[in-house]
Amino acid sequence: MIFSQVFWFTGLSGVGKTTVANSVKEYFVQKGQHVLVLDGDNVRHELHRHLGFSLSEIKKNNLLIAKLCQKHRHETNIIFVPIISPYRESRSLARSMLNPGFYEIHFDADMDTLCKRDTKGLYKLAQKGEMKNLIGFSAKNV
């Protein structure tokens, strides 16, 4: 029976979590492994679009993604979860639900680098005051 390892990639928007997850996925797929990427943005858009970005809604989205990991754990060898996951409480809950085999990996870059990358245009919006509570820019990441 398969029991996958879960790699919970955390970090601010634009730091490279999804890029790394997709690259590493391709490596393992070429080695014959079954790999699933549960990207936080994609899962939110496809399954949890009713959720906003308040503290409670972010925590709920993290919980629902951890439950998706549990659901798919016996179907794949590796699950990569690139997600901002800004709250320690949510990461601890995911760890308790998914241990053993849960690995939290934090990605980091300075704000200048993130603002230069800004692949989604979020930092530009935040700088202009058009986006409130961008995690790491105007909202806490704890």
Predicted regions and their residues:
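Small-molecule kinase domains that catalyze NTP-dependent phosphoryl transfer to phosphate-bearing small molecules
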Residues: 108-111, 116-142
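Phosphate-binding P-loop
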Residues: 1-4
